Amino acid sequence: MAKQVRAKKFLGQHFLRDEYVAEQTANLVDRDAVPSWLEIGPGMGVLTKYLVQKPIEFKAVELDRDSVAYLAKEMPSLEVLEADFLKTDIESLFNGPFGVIGNFPYNISSQILFKILDHRQTVPAFAGMFQLEVAKRIASGPNNKTYGILSVLVQAFYTITLEIEIPPTAFVPPPKVQSAVIYGARIEQEVDWNVKLFFDVVKTAFQQRRKTLSNALKKFNLPKEVCLNNQMFKLRAENLSVSDFIGLTHLIEQHQAQ
């Protein structure tokens, strides 16, 4: 047996050790018949050993050299790329679409999500372990304090379900926070709005979340009568649904084109 890997604080490592959580998380790859999956940060392979049993094309990306060496001894047939997921050209890893799964390091979990969004045409599904607070934020709906930028941007492209809540004892070393697994299934509909503008509108609206939209979105220079005649502009960002934000993006784009 290979020598155990010591978790490295600077990499934000908390190795999963709970077999039930690992098996239930691995089972999520069966949900939408995605043929290929990439695991981020397999560590010592507690989740990985369930994934390699699945009838899928499977690869892993791991930044920690010690973990890569451990996996090479324990799972010699597993293809592990020693690299930083955030700096990896993930489009070149498979010949077609693939899902993303893993116990995501909490200090970069939002960055991982944004990379998935950037490659959403290639990534039809993802399943990840997040800090519970972040997971709830991603899954949150409007009129809720936890509803924010991540909620809207992710839910515009993926249907989100919060699958499992996980206690700190499921990890080594145990984190100081609760965790959760969320699953995202891509929404298969045509994106008929300006995505770059949509991101800008959402981020701008929530950066001043206590202000009404008529004040928070001043930088877009909408005509005053548009703001006065549309009830949406009397609301705050947290009151708008994802579809409201898409409609708002259409409206702003329409007036920018005039």
Language-model regions, residue ranges each:
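Catalytic cores of RNA-modifying enzymes
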Residues: M1-T204, S243-L248, Q256-Q258
